[in-house]
């Protein structure tokens, strides 16, 4: 299991590296710079700063310089925030992380729990009115974009006298009661989509599980529908749906881009959008690392949970050939091919298996299969009519080294 988790973690790191590399080249391909000038004096200063920050260097040079600095693990490893070099990127981003995590994680938690509940209810009532009603809602919430739902909820907020704007943690007039009221609309905007995805998946899994023989056996033993659903249907429906949690978290972060702009949430997504427009490369890269890193780490954690609850993965993983074994096999095969490439009609003699010559070699105890050699004296080679130029003996599908010994 440990090897399996390490493998998934390694794949996550590779995926993150590829994503960040693509983003780096896309952002720098725009040609924008994060510095601007309003006078002739400013132009000279800006040009000097561009030279200092390395913007005049080729993009490939800046790319390798970025990774070298990132892996230096120094205080400024994340790079410079060009708009305000006195403030570090970490300070700016982490000041807004609580707002993003609050909206995203709370909406994901509520959406997943609501989706699991509605999926169970819909699946257990397959073909009934309740199932049809839930399916209609699922189709609506999947089809309608989150920003359209958000605009509709803004109208609803005005009708219910709810705050239309989100109250951030660092607001000057922050109060807990107003904060909770202002959180309802942004969170609901993300809840509907995530709950719809969970509902659809869980409902299909429940329908499939209910057709299994062990469910019919449980019912025939006299178990009620609630007990069957609790002990048999729920667990066997959740296990195949575990990977959906990864997509749910990623979807919540993706939806957060629009929700933060729509409801005034001072989060990480707002920084990313602003930074892309002015080519704040270091800020963009760190935001991508943060926004994509959490779903990737969540995917590794969920893979770990998946291995614990589903023994089939452990069995499949234990039956796989390890990378070290594959490398050993390739190395031995390469050596075998190199040996056969050295063999030709001039330096090898073919001996048929179970032939008289083969039996004579056995009687002389000349064949050593362990060391893959045939050891003969010069007189024995002459008596057996073995060529004096032969260095190898081909016996069946084996290639044995011919050695001359002094008897």
UniProtKB/Swiss-Prot annotation:
Topology versus the membrane: Multi-pass membrane protein
Single biological process term from Gene Ontology: peptide transport
Keyword Cytoplasm annotated: no
Localization (cell): Cell membrane
Membrane-traversing stretches: 9-29, 101-121, 134-154, 179-199, 238-258, 288-308
Keywords of this entry: Cell membrane, Membrane, Peptide transport, Protein transport, Transmembrane, Transmembrane helix, Transport
Pfam families xref list: BPD_transp_1 (PF00528), BPD_transp_1_N (PF19300)
Source domain of life: Bacteria
InterPro entries per the UniProt record, alphabetical: BPD_transp_1_N (IPR045621), MetI-like (IPR000515), MetI-like_sf (IPR035906)
Domain ABC transmembrane type-1: 97-307
Entry GO MF terms: transmembrane transporter activity
GO CC entries: plasma membrane
Function, as annotated: Part of the ABC transporter complex OppABCDF involved in the uptake of oligopeptides. Probably responsible for the translocation of the substrate across the membrane.
Similarity comment text for this entry: Belongs to the binding-protein-dependent transport system permease family. OppBC subfamily.
Protein name: Oligopeptide transport system permease protein OppB
Organism phylogeny: Bacteria, Bacillati, Mycoplasmatota, Mycoplasmoidales, Mycoplasmoidaceae
